[in-house]
Amino acid sequence: MVKNKVAPGQPKVSHLIRELRRLTGLSQEQFAATLGVAFSTINRWENGHMQPSPLALKQIKMMLNELTCSPVVELVEQSQILLVQYFSLSESSVG
């Protein structure tokens, strides 16, 4: 759980977490269990108090990649948008 400043022009990671949960239909508790973290960690990420660790970001990216294979067009489109916004340069660009 790394505390990083957001780079200018970079979308906040809290948006990424909320959107991924919305796309997957998972509660904060369910999302936490999927990533192997505590519920309070997800809550802190979404509220901008903490940033996900590099390992968590890797897992989040894998979840988004899996959604790009969905038969549901909206899931594919939204997951691709999030991948481009947050992971187009590298995991270290997420902030």
What are these regions (language model features)?
Residues 25-43:
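Short alpha-helical DNA-recognition segment
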Residues 2-23, 61:
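A short, Lys/Arg-rich alpha-helix, primarily the initiator
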Residues 7, 69-95:
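Short, charged recognition helix plus adjacent turn
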